[in-house]
């Protein structure tokens, strides 16, 4: 999955 810069990735 793609996350924006500085985004917190959930577990």
Swiss-Prot record:
One term under GO cellular component: extracellular region
Cell compartments where the protein resides: Secreted
GO function term, MF aspect, one: peptidase inhibitor activity
Tissue specificity of this protein: Expressed by the venom gland.
Modified residues (Pyrrolidone carboxylic acid): 1
Single GO biological process annotation from the record: regulation of blood pressure
Keyword terms, alphabetized: Hypotensive agent, Metalloenzyme inhibitor, Metalloprotease inhibitor, Protease inhibitor, Pyrrolidone carboxylic acid, Secreted, Toxin
Purpose: This peptide both inhibits the activity of the angiotensin-converting enzyme (ACE) and enhances the action of bradykinin by inhibiting the peptidases that inactivate it. It acts as an indirect hypotensive agent.
Family to which the UniProt record says this protein belongs: Belongs to the bradykinin-potentiating peptide family.
Identification of the protein by name: Bradykinin-potentiating peptide 11a
């Amino acid at each position: 999955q793609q996350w924006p810069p500085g985004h917190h990735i959930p577990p």
